[in-house]
Amino acid sequence: MKRNPNMAMLNANYLFPEINLRKRQFLAANPAAFLISLGIGDTTEPIPLSIAKSLAEASLGLGSLQGYSGYGPEQGIKTLRNQIAAKFYGGLMQAEEIFISDGAKCELGRLQMLFGNDISIAVQDPAYPVYVDGSLIQGVRKIIFMPCTPENQFFPDLSLVPRTDLIYFCSPNNPTGAAATRSQLEKLVGFAEANQSIIIFDSAYAHYIRDPSIPKSIFEIEGARKVALETGSFSKLAGFTGVRLGWTVIPEELKYDDGTSVKADWNRLTSTIFNGASNIAQAGGCAVLAEQGLEEVSRSIGFYLESAGIIKEALKKMGYLVFGGENAPYLWVRFEGKKSWDIFQRFLEQFHLVTTPGSGFGPSGEGFIRMTAFGHRDTILKAAKRLKAHHLIC
């Protein structure tokens, strides 16, 4: 059998496996070293107890006639969809427009399958690698990078962006930590309207936004229902990185050029290749959105943002230019004129800290590293202490 030629389009060394390889090589040469990881964005704190109990009860319930359930509705249980509509969208969206998923990453792959390969896409640069890599796997070849740098306040100059079918946009952004303002999102929606493009809006980190003036959803912007869909995630919201739960919102008004409903096609695709998110995970999601659950996850998010502030302060004292960490769990650190992998290696060898090279997120990420706020407080404090003990290393 012939290999799928689209796989040959991918970088042979995906960003995070390459980081893990370098970690292993360093530890093999320095077995006594204590590495602190501020690289991959995985949550570290326990799932709040009320939510964990709901997960356990749902699991145990499967062992009884009364509690057993098999396949659920592909769109997700109605209770959870109603809760998401009410708690996250305040009535802007209806439960019928919400689809429960097994996480945003898997959902992005299915969305890429939905739109196929005979399309053009625009992607923030830097951005989460899945937008580009997943598109390449589908066979998409027309990819436009939209530079988002400190010089343009991490928002692309749309006057320089050609018309594309899809626009991937993540706010707050991974990796830069930048959260788009209302004015910026209004420009984005207007641009999509003028070009008959569809925005895939990734809101995975929306619940880290603390500035009340910054929208948490693209659907807070007038006109977005006609040009956008949105993905959401419980991973960073509630520590569900291992549980796997998310959602996608597709408005009734979102149509293709021929007037066909995007939502109808999405329902058909997911009904064909997806049996729905785990019943256990969805029970946990309902617990997250209960009053107690929301209070508990808000405290967890506050904990991570405090950690971001600790690391940011240490980096600034060293003399670095640092972005993010206020409305997102990511810090974006600039090293003018340097290569990202060189900086990664210096942090690994000098501080015994694992970071993420900015170049792995796109051409405009060269000269940056990403650091995350995900870590136990004692390790965050140790990392900050190591940083404060040094001056500029580059």
Where does each model-flagged region fall?
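Conserved glycine-rich beta-strand-loop-beta hairpin in the small C-terminal domain of fold type I
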Residues: 282, 286, 301-312, 322-334, ...
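Helix C-cap/helix->beta junction micro-motif
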Residues: 30, 138, 194-195, 318, ...
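Generic structural signal for small/hydrophobic residues in well-ordered secondary structure
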Residues: 19, 38, 55, 84, ...
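Conserved PLP-binding catalytic core of the aspartate aminotransferase-like
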Residues: 46, 304-305, 318-350
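Conserved core segment of the aminotransferase class I/II
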Residues: 221-302, 309, 313, 391
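PLP-dependent enzyme catalytic core of the Aspartate aminotransferase-like
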Residues: 92, 346-355, 360-394
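N-terminal small-domain helix-loop-helix segment of the aminotransferase-like
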Residues: 2-103, 110, 288-291, 394
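Conserved core of the PLP fold type I
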Residues: 64-192, 206-221
